[in-house]
């Protein structure tokens, strides 16, 4: 069968590559994809991820069996709704269900209603009221833009000055446009963070192996929040009991609650969690595969990925089985200056020297007229390596990262140290 993946990042590269491993998959198309995907026999389609008419047209012409929509923007713009209305099977939540990611305020109200553990919070549209609440609560405190901000709309403020600046940027300077006209201020939670993704179809929840993402730009979890600078899976210091508790107290009630709200969720429900002294709590929900978590979790899936998605789309029970042994580590190469201002068009060197047993997931790359790869985004690519232990994975992966050393790019040297 032929399949279509919508999106252009490292996550979509990982999804497409995994689909190609499936027995009865002939071609995987990616719209719009990126040039690096071609190296893994993924067919690129020059259609924007939100061009509903173009995508539907192509899916019909290419006789696509089903579509997977990767990023949050097309999900919230109703691309899945459009495919379904056109009679094309699409995996991902419809726009009204993707709101669990699209609005932090909606997610908070939803969690309160269904008794899903999360930090206490309040939502504001007026700067003076928000500032007064901030003064009352003190620091540390967390300030979030209500809408989508590419993973950068959250400030964990340890100093009052930082908190006030974040609030001003969001509400007065409109740093994230309409996304930050409404702001959620929530209590700071201390603990170990981890990501738990699940395949969801209505009330049915099939959890994946957990991962740990590294949100901050610099070593030692310092610097601004990013889309994610690296990840690994599984997370040895988070016990199976904790994961089971998160599935039973967070994912299942969320899936059930969405059905009750008439927002039937079929797709990937991602819970960004923190293990507190009171058990796991929700930091955020996303309505799709995490990036960079997907690049370390999907390679660990032993079941046939295309068959799994097809089963969910046909309301059948899928086989979901992950590797129990070993660990997969992924490190992001980013453009210097990311997540703030960065240059595009910088040449990547050393790509041809990477070991064959290291996976390369392209994200912000493209080929120039000479066929050389240059940067086209903040997060450029991710290298991933599976090994028996984290020490082995780090020892094998970081020399490969060094082959890409270049003043125009940077990466964190400490991804995975917590799991050694």
UniProtKB/Swiss-Prot annotation:
GO terms for biological process: 'de novo' IMP biosynthetic process; purine nucleobase biosynthetic process. The gene is purD. Its cofactor is Mg(2+); Mn(2+). ATP binds at residues 134-195. Gene3D superfamilies: 3.40.50.20, ATP-grasp fold, A domain (3.30.1490.20), ATP-grasp fold, B domain (3.30.470.20), Phosphoribosylglycinamide synthetase, C-terminal domain (3.90.600.10). Mg(2+) binds at residues 284, 286. It catalyses: 5-phospho-beta-D-ribosylamine + glycine + ATP = N(1)-(5-phospho-beta-D-ribosyl)glycinamide + ADP + phosphate + H(+). This is Phosphoribosylamine--glycine ligase. GO terms for molecular function: ATP binding; metal ion binding; phosphoribosylamine-glycine ligase activity. The keyword Nucleus does not apply. Belongs to the GARS family. Binds 1 Mg(2+) or Mn(2+) ion per subunit. Pathway: Purine metabolism; IMP biosynthesis via de novo pathway; N(1)-(5-phospho-D-ribosyl)glycinamide from 5-phospho-alpha-D-ribose 1-diphosphate: step 2/2. It comes from the Bacteria. Residues 108-314 form the ATP-grasp domain. NCBIfam families: purD. Signal peptide: none annotated. Keywords: ATP-binding, Ligase, Magnesium, Manganese, Metal-binding, Nucleotide-binding, Purine biosynthesis. Its EC number is 6.3.4.13.
